[in-house]
């Protein structure tokens, strides 16, 4: 029997509902429960796949090929439970499904309305694809009071009535701001946020109050009194130095104990040793390295959320602090490469789309190759590494990607077909933008004796992809003559997945996104190895 915990947010956006949900999931998991986490997004897009990174941030890709909200990355990193397509829904997808049913006649001529048809579709999603999970935590995107979120709030209100308190719990995350001129915390925004939630029929069972300092006992009791919750169910969500300290902080505030009491569960205390170990390593590093991230969406760092976390995971594994130097690739198109990159111990070029800033990334690759600085190219970063080698080593001075327009030497081109298991998948360049991607987990065979095979410690791996362009195998022979090794291929040998330069301290480009599978307690081997190479570069060891 799965129990449902619904997490809502109020007062302002960006309070950290995703992290709060992930941390609560980790605490319940540490008590021995099996958990599942889901995100309900109120926006009208079908998925975030075609949204601007500046608008939405990172698109998190699951093994089964769903393009989802970045909060699912938090869920996976904190619990280790792989997210699935059924763990993220948007208003756009809900309405698409409802309209499709209406067109098929599934509603038998009824007038299709938000209640009950849209709310029923939301409830169906919440309860679907669950087996033996003890808890399903559902985060409702947006802020209470938004027009877009009303159908979702109504749906979870109905679920609360249908399933009863024995199987449902409502958690509300609010802000308790400190007013310097008054010298005190203010509880009124929280009171009004709960009032707004009550207006749609939801009484929260627990309040998580974001604040930058301890909430005095008197203020906690005041919030409890006016918001109709138990005093110990007012949980201060204090600012902490590292997000991986959040589960420890929430446990110290009694959050998981309140949840267990609500459901009448007698569970053992959580084992938080691995979180304590992670926090200790973050607080007491034995050195530090600086990694240059040469990207194009750096004005919104959420665009690279999983990437930044994976680099920090590599730092945890090597017991060093990782400083990230974010650099807009466009500045390298006018020069200044040495000035920006010389102080760095490693260079990483992440994924991206489009020509803007692309050849600045090529210059960053050239610097890393010629100066023997550890280089890690991910997705677009691998393609730029191949273009750099084709131009400066193989003699194809006009080598480019068809993504940027027609060219005589397209060393990178649009994929039109590939194998997924025993099935041939095809895409057309004229198809919908959201339907032309190679998405999800695909296997890759690693070359015997290669650096990546040594790093992974196995011959076949599975990694997550999100791309529509691929390195052209027609140039493989000429590129390998220059010293660029194609060390990872799809099992059918058609698609190049990894390139490396054996005669280099550390130079690896991958077509997939390894950052999506990295966790603080299980760092991805490529990031662990890359940071180790950066440590050697910095002469720390």
From Swiss-Prot:
Per the UniProt record, which EC number(s) apply here? 6.3.4.2
Question: Record's family?
Answer: Belongs to the CTP synthase family.
**Disulfide bridge partners, by residue number:** none
Protein name, entry field: CTP synthase
**Domain (Glutamine amidotransferase type-1) ranges:** 290-540
Regulation of this protein's activity per its record? Allosterically activated by GTP, when glutamine is the substrate; GTP has no effect on the reaction when ammonia is the substrate. The allosteric effector GTP functions by stabilizing the protein conformation that binds the tetrahedral intermediate(s) formed during glutamine hydrolysis. Inhibited by the product CTP, via allosteric rather than competitive inhibition.
Q: What else is known?
A: CTPSs have evolved a hybrid strategy for distinguishing between UTP and CTP. The overlapping regions of the product feedback inhibitory and substrate sites recognize a common feature in both compounds, the triphosphate moiety. To differentiate isosteric substrate and product pyrimidine rings, an additional pocket far from the expected kinase/ligase catalytic site, specifically recognizes the cytosine and ribose portions of the product inhibitor.
Residues the entry annotates as binding L-glutamine: 54, 352, 380-383, 403, 468
The UniProt record gives the binding positions of UTP as: 13, 186-191, 222
Question: Region annotation Amidoligase domain: residue ranges?
Answer: 1-265
Q: In which pathway does it act?
A: Pyrimidine metabolism; CTP biosynthesis via de novo pathway; CTP from UDP: step 2/2
Q: What class of enzyme is it?
A: ligase
Cited Gene3D superfamilies: 3.40.50.880, P-loop containing nucleotide triphosphate hydrolases
Function recorded in the entry: Catalyzes the ATP-dependent amination of UTP to CTP with either L-glutamine or ammonia as the source of nitrogen. Regulates intracellular CTP levels through interactions with the four ribonucleotide triphosphates.
Subunit comment:
Homotetramer.
Cited PROSITE patterns: GATASE_TYPE_1 (PS51273)
Which residue windows are coiled coil?
A: none
Which positions are annotated as binding ATP?
14-19, 71
Share an example GO biological-process annotation for this protein. Answer: 'de novo' CTP biosynthetic process
What keywords tag this UniProt record? ATP-binding, Glutamine amidotransferase, Ligase, Magnesium, Metal-binding, Nucleotide-binding, Pyrimidine biosynthesis
GO cellular component terms, alphabetically, are:
cytosol
């Amino acid at each position: 029997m799965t129990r449902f915990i619904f997490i809502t947010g109020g007062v302002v956006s960006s309070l950290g509902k995703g992290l709060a949900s992930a941390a609560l999931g980790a605490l319940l998991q540490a008590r021995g429960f099996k958990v599942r986490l889901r995100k309900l997004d109120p926006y009208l897009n079908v998925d975030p796949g075609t949204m601007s990174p500046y608008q939405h941030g990172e698109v998190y890709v699951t093994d089964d090929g769903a393009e989802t909200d970045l909060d699912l990355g938090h869920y996976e990193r904190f619990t280790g439970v792989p997210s699935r397509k059924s763990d993220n829904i948007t208003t756009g997808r809900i309405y698409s499904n409802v309209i499709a049913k209406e067109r098929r006649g599934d509603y038998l001529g009824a007038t299709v309305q938000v209640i009950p048809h849209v709310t029923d579709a939301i409830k169906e999603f919440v309860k679907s694809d669950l087996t033996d999970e003890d808890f399903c935590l559902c985060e409702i995107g947006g802020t209470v009071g938004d027009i877009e979120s009303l159908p979702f709030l109504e749906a979870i209100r109905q679920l609360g009535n249908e399933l009863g308190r024995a199987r449902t719990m409502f958690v509300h995350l609010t802000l308790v701001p400190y007013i310097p001129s008054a010298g005190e915390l203010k509880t009124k925004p929280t009171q009004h946020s709960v009032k707004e939630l009550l207006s749609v029929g939801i009484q929260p069972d627990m309040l998580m109050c974001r604040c930058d300092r301890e909430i005095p006992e008197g203020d906690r009791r005041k919030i409890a009194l006016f918001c109709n919750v138990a005093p110990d169910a007012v949980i201060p969500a204090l600012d902490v130095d590292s997000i991986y300290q959040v589960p420890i902080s929430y446990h110290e505030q009694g959050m998981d104990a309140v949840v267990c009491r609500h459901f009448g569960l007698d569970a053992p205390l959580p084992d938080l040793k691995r979180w304590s170990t992670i926090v200790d390593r973050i607080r007491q590093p034995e050195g530090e390295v600086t990694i240059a991230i040469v990207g194009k969406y750096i004005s919104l760092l959420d665009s690279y959320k999983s990437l930044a976390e994976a680099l920090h995971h590599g730092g945890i594994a090597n017991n060093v602090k990782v400083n990230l130097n974010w650099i807009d690739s466009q500045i390298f198109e006018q020069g200044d490469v040495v000035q920006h990159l010389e102080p760095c111990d490693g260079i990483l070029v992440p994924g991206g789309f489009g020509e803007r800033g692309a050849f600045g990334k090529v210059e960053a690759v050239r610097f890393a190759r010629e100066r023997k600085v550890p280089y890690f190219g991910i997705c677009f970063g691998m393609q730029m590494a191949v273009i750099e080698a084709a131009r400066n080593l193989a003699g194809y001075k006009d080598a480019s990607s068809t993504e940027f327009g027609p060219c005589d030497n397209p060393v990178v081109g649009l994929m039109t077909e590939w194998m997924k298991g025993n099935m041939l998948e095809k895409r057309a360049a004229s198809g919908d933008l959201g339907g032309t991607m190679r998405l999800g987990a695909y296997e890759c065979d690693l070359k015997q004796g290669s650096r990546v095979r040594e790093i992974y410690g196995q011959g076949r791996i599975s990694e997550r992809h999100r791309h529509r362009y691929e390195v052209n195998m027609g140039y493989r022979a000429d590129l390998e003559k220059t010293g660029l090794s194609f060390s990872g291929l799809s099992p059918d040998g058609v698609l190049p997945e990894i390139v490396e330069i054996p005669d280099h301290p550390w130079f690896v480009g991958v077509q997939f996104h390894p950052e999506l599978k990295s966790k603080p307690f299980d760092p991805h081997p490529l990031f662990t190895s890359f940071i180790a190479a950066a440590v050697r570069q910095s002469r720390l060891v």
